[in-house]
């Protein structure tokens, strides 16, 4: 029981290296929207 608590307490430190990635993640859907627009511009908005 105590071991599990210690493990959960250490998890945020373990994931600290992913902080920059988490900062970027919300932008990805916007990139897909921009990609869709560029694709439509490339095919001439058929």
From Swiss-Prot:
What spans does the record annotate as topological domain Lumenal, numbered to this chain?
10-19
Q: Name one Pfam family in it.
A: PsbK
The keyword Acyltransferase is annotated on this UniProt entry? no
* Cofactor binding remark: PSII binds multiple chlorophylls, carotenoids and specific lipids.
Output the SUPFAM superfamilies linked to this UniProt entry.
Answer: Photosystem II reaction center protein K, PsbK
Record keyword Transmembrane helix present: yes
Record keywords, A-Z: Membrane, Photosynthesis, Photosystem II, Reaction center, Thylakoid, Transmembrane, Transmembrane helix
Disruption outcome: No changes in growth under low, medium or high light regimes (3-300 umol photon/m(2)/s). PsbZ and Psb30/Ycf12 are missing from isolated PSII, although low levels of PsbZ can be detected in thylakoid membranes.
**NCBIfam families given in the database record:** PRK02553.1 (NF002715)
Q: Which family does it belong to?
A: Belongs to the PsbK family.
Name-wise, this protein is Photosystem II reaction center protein K
**Species in which this protein is naturally found:** Thermosynechococcus vestitus (strain NIES-2133 / IAM M-273 / BP-1)
Q: Which gene encodes it?
A: psbK
